[in-house]
Curated annotation (Swiss-Prot):
Organism placement in taxonomy: Viruses, Duplodnaviria, Heunggongvirae, Uroviricota, Caudoviricetes
Protein location: Virion
InterPro entries reported in the protein's UniProt record: T4-gp15_tss, T4-gp15_tss_sf
Record flagged with keyword Ion transport: no
Subunit structure: Hexamer. Interacts with gp3 and gp18 on the bottom part of the hexamer. Interacts with gp13 and gp14 on the top part of the hexamer.
Species name: Enterobacteria phage T4
Biased composition (Polar residues): 251-260
Compositional bias annotation for Pro residues: 262-272
Protein name: Tail completion protein gp15
Length: 272
């Protein structure tokens, strides 16, 4: 709309969700001992994943080609919906500042809150495999789970935020009926709500005030201790080159009379 920028926000949330469910395992009891199998996770739409299971090279295909069977269990993750998250709205005029150098400061306005809906589809051939997978997920969502991520990692203004993930619903689809040639497939779908943020572009901050000059235009004022009169009050942050987010509110003030303001090439600062 108003110039190119890209903060990879959607990609980061998809990576977060994929990483969250990437270490799920099932256990198979064999004569030689227990065998643990890590369940692979794929980011794709549910329809695309089902087409892959039933494609013309599948084990059930009648085509005269080499058959390749999709290995189960597998997990499929997909973003299905998103909307504006009004309860998390903040003041759109607030800015985050970061000093990049002695004279360079970048700023960014508050992000826009969004609510993303992810669907996690689990496909197995055996009921016990499904129980093992789901029981490694459900205990952590009561009904929400908080995790921490760096939003805009590697950008000018990185931000560490707690992300709330809520388990909304579950749907069970078990293909109990079928002919002798079809393979049994069990499918459970879990729906999650993720509270996220979309960030605006980062711009150079202009007009960052570190020194102020106040003149009373020939009207004199008494000093608080009664030691003299003044017509100008100057204030400056201490130290002058401090980062805005590190400033503790310390200010240096001077009271002067008949002293001109510094002009370039003189450096700015309180008059003495």
């Amino acid at each position: 709309m108003f110039g190119y920028f890209y903060n990879s926000s959607f990609r980061r949330y998809a990576t977060l969700m994929g990483d969250l469910f990437s270490n799920i395992q099932i256990k198979r009891q064999l004569e030689s001992g227990d065998k643990f199998i890590r369940v692979p996770i794929t980011y794709a739409s549910k329809e695309h994943f089902m087409m892959k299971l039933n494609k013309w090279t599948s084990i059930n295909s009648q085509e005269d080609v080499a058959k390749v069977e999709t290995i189960l269990p597998r997990i499929n993750l997909h973003l299905v919906d998103f909307s504006y998250n009004a309860p998390f709205k903040t003041n759109i005029l607030n800015q985050n500042l970061l000093q990049k150098g002695a004279t360079s400061v970048v700023s960014q306005y508050n992000p826009s809150p969004i609510k993303m809906i992810y669907e996690l589809s689990i496909f197995t051939r055996y009921e016990d495999d499904m129980f093992q997978i789901v029981e490694q997920i459900l205990p952590y969502f009561q009904p929400h789970f908080n995790t921490t991520m760096y939003e805009q990692f590697g950008n000018d203004i990185p931000f560490k935020r707690d992300i709330k993930i809520v388990l909304m619903s579950a749907a069970i689809d078990e293909a109990i009926d079928g002919d002798n040639l079809s393979r049994r497939r069990i499918e459970w779908s879990l729906t999650f709500e993720v509270n996220g943020w979309m960030y605006p572009p980062v711009d150079d901050a202009e007009g960052l005030i570190r020194t102020t000059y106040t003149d009373f235009h020939a009207n004199t004022r008494d000093l608080p201790d009664g030691e003299g009169v003044f017509e100008s009050v100057d204030s400056e942050v201490v130290p002058r080159d401090i980062d805005p987010e590190d400033w503790d509110g310390t200010v240096k003030q001077t009271f002067t009379s008949n002293v001109n303001r510094p002009t370039p090439p003189e450096p700015p600062g309180p008059r003495t």
